Amino acid sequence: MFKHEKQLLNGMQVKVERENPQYAVLMQEQLGGANGELKAAMQYLSQSFRVKDQALKDLFLDIGTEELSHMEIVAETINLLNGHSVNYEVVGVGEVESHVLSGLTPFLVNSSGEPWTANYVSVTGDIVADLLSNIASEQRAKVVYEYLYRQINDKEVRRTIDFLLNREEAHNALFREALNKVKNEGSNKDFGVTEDSKLYFDLSTPGRYVQDPNPTEPSFSNPRR
């Protein structure tokens, strides 16, 4: 069950220094993009349905729910940046849907105007694979927010981005902690138990491949030659 609280997450107040439709276009990436908030929410909530451990299930549900609140924050930021005047020319060659289709309403598209798709969502039913996917998702989302921060010269929007970026770091840390707790479960049960799984083929330099009757675990710092 979900309930909507009128107050934004953590008492957040979304503000902008001034209207800027181009900045709104950039922020659309984190609303309807492949590494955006809607994608994260749908991914974690969908994954939670097959998680048996109640503590981990709660983690997936809690973070997924928080991502929905992030989506609300991003959408409100876009709404303020778009202002009140419908004029596709102000976004140049950027995403024009909000000016010709949605009447400036934040739209479920990315910064190029491509619609959100469930193809962005990764669900395997394997707790280890899903956690690894989520760690990578949070890292990518952080990178996108860093790019946005560098390009958006609005201190209020930057404050919002900084908060969201830091929350991606928190989620990343939580998923990493969860991964440590299930390191011998799921697809990790028989991980690295055969000789083939311990080979590192040194294909980048001249010389023999790894051919050893007693292979050691792969190592990037000291490859067997």
Swiss-Prot record:
It catalyses: 2 H2O2 = O2 + 2 H2O. SUPFAM superfamilies: Ferritin-like (SSF47240). Its EC number is 1.11.1.6. CDD domains: Mn_catalase. InterPro entries: Ferritin-like, Ferritin-like_SF, Mn_catalase, Mn_catalase_dom. Its cofactor is Ca(2+); Mn(2+). One of its GO terms (molecular function) is catalase activity. Mn(2+) 1 binds at E37, E67, H70. Keywords: Calcium, Manganese, Metal-binding, Oxidoreductase, Peroxidase. Residues 204-225 are annotated as: Disordered. It holds the Pfam family Mn_catalase. Gene3D superfamilies: 1.20.1260.10. Residues 213-225 have a biased composition (Polar residues). It comes from the Bacteria. Mn(2+) 2 binds at E67, E138, H171. The keyword Oxidoreductase applies. The keyword Manganese applies. It is an enzyme of class 1 (oxidoreductase). Binds 1 Ca(2+) ion per subunit. Binds 2 manganese ions per subunit. Ca(2+) binds at D58, D62, S204. Belongs to the manganese catalase family. Catalyzes the decomposition of hydrogen peroxide into water and oxygen. This is Probable manganese catalase.
